[in-house]
Structure formats: structure tokens, C-alpha cells
């Protein structure tokens, strides 16, 4: 299991940040991803593996005013 934004989700071998975002429907262009508190740059999404037990945070960036 992994935790995504405080909710438990199933984990599978070979899961990447990009695959997780696609599977969970995170399509908003401006997001920040952290895995176990470590920022993951957008260019690394396809390569960054998510391990069983990881804590993933996905945050949408929204400007207000």
C-alpha cells in the first residue's frame, strides 16, 4: 500500500509518479509532487519509482486574488 494525500491506495511493482498521476486522474497542469517529503521535478515523473509504503503528496497550484 501507498498513501496518496492521506488516503491508502494499492501499490504495484514498477509504479512511477507519472503512472500514478494518470491512473488517479490528476490532469491539472500545475501540480507539485512530493514522495516521502522529497520534491519530484516534473521532468522526473516518468522515471521516479514509487515504492511500497511510500507517502505521496500531490498538490494543485492555484492562484487567488
List the model feature ranges, each with a label.
Residues 1-64:
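Ubiquitin-like/PB1-type beta-grasp interaction modules and other compact soluble beta-rich domains
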Amino acid at each position: 500500500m501507498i498513501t496518496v494525500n492521506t488516503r491508502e491506495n494499492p501499490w504495484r511493482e514498477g509504479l512511477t509518479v507519472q503512472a500514478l498521476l494518470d491512473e488517479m486522474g490528476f490532469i491539472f497542469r500545475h501540480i507539485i509532487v512530493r514522495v516521502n517529503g522529497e520534491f519530484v521535478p516534473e521532468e522526473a515523473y516518468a522515471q521516479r519509482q514509487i515504492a511500497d509504503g511510500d507517502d505521496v503528496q500531490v498538490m494543485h497550484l492555484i492562484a487567488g486574488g
